[in-house]
Amino acid sequence: MKNKRFKEKIEKYLKRQFGVTIDSASKRQVYEALMSTIREDLSEKKFAYEQELKKTRQKRAYYMSMEFLVGRTLRNNLFNLDLEKDVREYFADNGISLDEIYDIEPDPGLGNGGLGRLASCYLDALTSSDYPVTGFSILYEYGIFKQVINNGWQQEFPDYWLDLGKYGLVYRNDEEVEVRFYGRVEEKLTEDGFKVEHKDYTSIQAEPYDLLISGYKTGTVNTLRLWEAKAKTGFNMKLFEHGEYSKSSEAEAIASSISKLLYPADSTNEGKELRIKQQYFFISASIQQLLKNHYNEFGTLENLFEHVALHINDTHPAMGVPELMRLLLDEYGYSWDKAWDITTKTFAYTNHTIMAEALEKWSVELFKPLLPRIYSIIEEINKRFCQWVIDQGKDYTLAETAIIYDNQIRMANLSIVGSHNVNGVSKLHSDILVDSTFRAFHELYPTKFGNVTNGITHRRWLGQANPELAEYLEDLIGDDFVKDLSKIDKLNKYAKDKKVVEKLQEIKKVKKEQLAKYIQETTGITVNPDSIFDVQVKRLHEYKRQLLNALHIVYLYREIKYNGLRPVPRTFIFAAKASSGYQMAKNIIKFIHSISQLIESDELVRDYIKVVFLPDYKVTLAEKIIPAADISEQISQAGKEASGTGNMKLMLNGALTLGTLDGANVEIHEAVGDDNIFIFGLETPEVDELNRHGYKPWEYYNSSARIKDTLDFIRTMTVGGMNFSFIVDYLLTQDSYMCLADFESYVAAQELVAKTYQDKEKWGQMSLINTANAGIFSADRSVEEYAKDIWNIKKVK
């Protein structure tokens, strides 16, 4: 091994901790030694990096997100530190498979879907680009949940990831802080002015753990700060002795619940209350700590916005606005006007959805007793904002823009009012925000809104997930694209080169064979690697329309079985988690499994189509599926998907997009042109028009033989004793996301996919063009826009 120092560290750790040598150590011992050695190396780099930042005193960004879906860290760190090849060879010389060591590491249970993965991509990209940034979130003990499929139904179990995942974390006991809930607020006038005192509160200790973020071949090391909740005082013997049994352990109960699970079900008041506690807990801890550090360095907070950029990633961290106000007012003695000026110059907000149910609202009745001081500040912000709107002569907007309205606290409105910048995450999404969702706000703040299209960290999604493709591209066009993905456009000149196109398809076949093996081992289903791998992998939600995909599969089943269709063989691959309280999403998972079962039991049909549902979708599983995909299903109803990033990862790996003109699909379409993408369905204005005139799904049933035959078949379809008439009833009476309106167009697009796939040369060229034009979807480009246009931060030299 070239890096002798790194090798010696691993061997010393094994000897010191376990009394073993590298050739006699267990895989678990080798894993622990490797994780700990990397953590130590990153800590040393971090120290040097922080010393440089202390000299420059430059502005830093703080990215606040309820989730960070980081994926496994071990391979990512070895790749970024340029150690992977060395360690692989060193381990091989000692009879150890590095890939087997990788497989020991669990995915950290810190995120769920696209929001968390985007946050992690941005931390990676910012670090690789030498920008100073810290992420803030919660150290969830059990993650979101481990998904197990039992008889086609999703079941949720705790995800015990910390036992093996803890080796990458650094505990910072010097930076613990107190977070307060409940109690009452007393206001009084003193010699020093107006004072507010929070009394009879429940105190929770926030304990910090740092996950160090490496950059690609750089000395920059940033931090993801994760807070764990602990009871500050523990069991209260005095209260217990006085018969107040539940109150005696109240703090312990609150603390243990806060950092247990990501996104507890919010169908009850208890669940809603827990979500509020989680959000305030990590926001309060984070802002308290960074203000303390800033004040210790500068002796004032008046220059906070010159050195600190706070970012609200979706509405979950929106309480940062009143919390910063609380600290400035109550702890540091600033006037309201001065505190508000500092706050609004410090915060920026990214909106990630136009879905009404995802624009968080909390009832005053629930919120006020839980966070009395924060509520009083929100109330004052709302009062002053409403008066300002009236003074502008725009009082007609208040029904839409007021922060507190109809006894609800609207967190998106709080984020907009309290931030100096608001951005959407794709061109279409940002247009919808200013033209529709936040139209009234745009009228009030015409210069506040902008767009930053999402991006992905290609070093993980190509370099690590698909090393075969990455290595070939490096040989073909050079390795510039690893640092700067825009350079991948050099591949375009090979679009007509048969040898290159064939080689790319050979690599795709290798990845499909690898995935086929995994599918066989995981589900017992044998799939044909020469079939079209048609992939839809994302959170299960009605607007993402996994149901439309399933309807098409049932349509194909009928055509093959009864009408003599003999299509190009196709493997439909799904992976998705449904929120634990989302019954319709769970029903769709069951429906997909039942279709798979129906097909597997039919000797004729199973030769042509297969349906695979891979359980427990997470980053590591995505890294297996995405490089093997031929078709990328991005079929949300137009106007509903803010951006998406799975579409970008699949495009980069040569999958062809089958999608609506929604989210970032619009920009993928612009990048590759009409001939290298399969577009179908209604566009956003047509969806809006149909909604205005009243969408009637029955009309599509009556006018389309394909729809009628498919739905009639589903009504009679019974698999494992279960009938799916309720799916048909839902589609004919609600069809909230217009599956039937887009069905005929979708089937036609799928027929074009099948026809095109038979022309291997053309398909290969289309695949190449998608990879070659993925450069604009690099997270490096996205974070550059945030750094320059929103946060005003500079690279560390």
Task: Mark where each language-model region is.
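A conserved ligand/cofactor-binding region detector
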Residues: 1-797
